Swiss-Prot record:
Catalyzed reactions per annotation: citrate = D-threo-isocitrate
Molecular-function GO terms, alphabetical: 4 iron, 4 sulfur cluster binding; aconitate hydratase activity; iron-responsive element binding; metal ion binding
UniProt family annotation: Belongs to the aconitase/IPM isomerase family.
Cofactor(s) needed by this chain: [4Fe-4S] cluster
Gene: ACO1
Record-given protein name: Cytoplasmic aconitate hydratase
Protein localization: Cytoplasm, Cytosol
GO biological process assignments: citrate metabolic process; response to iron(II) ion; tricarboxylic acid cycle
Keywords attached to this entry: 4Fe-4S, Cytoplasm, Iron, Iron-sulfur, Lyase, Metal-binding, RNA-binding, Tricarboxylic acid cycle
Lineage: Eukaryota, Metazoa, Chordata, Craniata, Vertebrata
PROSITE patterns documented for this protein: ACONITASE_1, ACONITASE_2
Broadest EC class assigned to this enzyme: lyase
CC annotations in GO: cytosol
Amino acid sequence: MSNPFAYLAEPLDPAQPGKKFFNLNKLDYSRYGRLPFSIRVLLEAAVRNCDKFLVKKEDIENILNWNVTQHMNIEVPFKPARVILQDFTGVPSVVDFAAMRDAVKKLGGDPEKINPICPVDLVIDHSIQVDFNRRADSLQKNQDLEFERNRERFEFLKWGSKAFRNMRIIPPGSGIIHQVNLEYLARVVFDQDGYYYPDSLVGTDSHTTMIDGLGVLGWGVGGIEAEAVMLGQPISMVLPQVIGYRLMGKPHPLVTSTDIVLTITKHLRQVGVVGKFVEFFGLGVAQLSIADRATIANMCPEYGATATFFPVDEVSIKYLVQTGRDESKVKQIRKYLQAVGMFRDYSDPSQDPDFTQVVELDLKTVVPCCSGPKRPQDKVAVSDMKKDFESCLGAKQGFKGFQVAPDHHNDHKTFIYNDSEFTLSHGSVVIAAITSCTNTSNPSVMLGAGLLAKKAVDAGLNVKPYVKTSLSPGSGVVTYYLRESGVMPYLSQLGFDVVGYGCMTCIGNSGPLPEPVVEAITQGDLVAVGVLSGNRNFEGRVHPNTRANYLASPPLVIAYAIAGTIRIDFEKEPLGTNAKGQQVFLRDIWPTREEIQAVERQYVIPGMFTEVYQKIETVNASWNALAAPSDKLYLWNPKSTYIKSPPFFENLTLDLQPPKSIVDAYVLLNLGDSVTTDHISPAGNIARNSPAARYLTNRGLTPREFNSYGSRRGNDAIMARGTFANIRLLNRFLNKQAPQTIHLPSGETLDVFDAAERYQQEGHPLIVLAGKEYGSGSSRDWAAKGPFLLGIKAVLAESYERIHRSNLVGMGVIPLEYLPGENADSLGLTGRERYTIIIPENLTPRMHVQVKLDTGKTFQAVIRFDTDVELTYLHNGGILNYMIRKMAK
């Protein structure tokens, strides 16, 4: 179909008439010039892709008229330029694509129509675990184990890169997806098919937002939604409000980018930005490097926004040059963005656009801080950490409480490790990990950690041998500058050897703790601590034996590792005493900003980025040696425990089946607030007594071969058994933490999977009751696929995290929301009732539907299908069914 906005296309350079761009200034500059820069990107994509069908003329008018329409809950389409995947979410996406090809063929269509039509990059970074640490060969041993465990998955992904066009694999050992995206994959501006246009993307990882720090609009979506984008379907989204975040002033010399982002995270959680964009402006932004901006943008999911945007400016351009991008392309990037009104001068207030609301932060008010012990938004000043932890010890069980009786606050347990005696108590640090894309992409905090390590070693300090220390950089560039600057030996001396290039501890791949440490923690019932430079610290995520976990900057991770406890006041108490009997305080070894900047200027150089990235796709010999078939249809191996054809499309026909009312459903689980996708579908270790473990054992596997839930996402039988299998799940039916529930007809307490299986055998539909922020955390599509396979037809919650709600929609599971001011408690719901949810034939977005109980009580709930497109997916039984029917016709 012809584009009605073709008249806006003109050459960027008269000397190159074949290279055009859509000049949005011609639309209506009085409105366009007032739009937030992030909304301008949405507008450009809509104008360029307008076909009067998927993207209509009225969509462009609605976006251009954002000042009015932002308050009207209006749906607009967005076609991102590309998609990125990581392997934990990428494997199920490729499994779905393979199964969809089978389904299209079965329905009489051309299976090769199932193929990405936009560029797709899949970065393998989630599989490696910290099995070995504190030894020079840790990296090689962990990488060898990664291949041993994941060979079948990797062969499958290699098949996918051959079978599907436009799919590129970045092999294991290359780095973390978001740092590789920032340093290498990001185009900033596309030059394709004769047009320049802004780079934009969605990714199957919630921290995809990190790229917004470079001025590339992107955010995390569920794997199901990403698959639809890959097949050419636009994302259907409610036109977001945009919160302007003004930064002023300069940070204190002791403050790191981590401190700034933890402060912003707490602030924006309080402001309330769920479902909104945040766009930064003000003189303070110019003080921040791209690495600092990327750190702030990375934590976007932790404060609940959809995207956190830093428009491109001179600092962005310098970063592109610094990271080895082609200088002629960088000039074109600047020229295009200036021509289309998307290049920013943060010192010029006349460029400040209109915002829905403006909030601000003076950077000089930020103090060194951590976040924890169970949520990233629970910021604690470093000066208050000791007092805060001791308060949490005795507080009621909750986000800030462990309910330890006062007479047990000083409990301790001695143990023998490597022939020496040590003592653990509440607050003892047993994991200290410099990890995650959030911080390892930032040279200032990484070099700061290295310089602190050097000073600590020079002062005679060390880390106790039982503390599990690790360094997992986000790319080879980090190792390069740590080695070249001479700080790597000091990090190694304190136990922070490079253990792998990947997410590792941040996603729960922290590996085992020493057995004597685990015994001391469990026998003493101690609240042990993990300290990590990550972005999430939900209970049970980092390690099953660390009940308290704090997010901190890399230098503070080392400081707490040396101290050995979180119960320390750094101002008043020494980090330790050296062999000479001298007390050494944190202030004695903390590097100055000038020291860090001098080292950064000398060692973080373009040649380093070029050397690392020019061989990134070919340097891994183990990956190169993998064999993979070249068939267009995947040959499923019935004996495989990693890759299995999913049951989602088994009974699919071309005929639509309209949604039906849910009649006499039982409640499988009665949950509270902030149930995360980690609770719903854990990514970490498979417990030996779990339904998933029984499944694997029955197939002849030993516990050593179980691997993790995340690595098993290509097998629906394991993932269904792993649904709600988190040992920290708090189900109100039981009033204790356990991956169990009550089978209401019999009154038996069973594992969640076993209870769901029995309900399904009895022919009973199921629902889940929940509180606020249901599904927060990772963009985990199995947190929707798993409940679907358990027979859960609907979830009734007070509110949903954005990505999880869209994943439920994508699977045809109905997200219901209590009316404002209502919840399970106010309505007197126990969860032991039977629920009938009336789904009318004339269903409309966000319609109020009736819920009837077998007690005779009735109430209204909002059906959270927010757009007409989402209702179309419901009528098809989910988004993938819709795409298969579309491709098979």
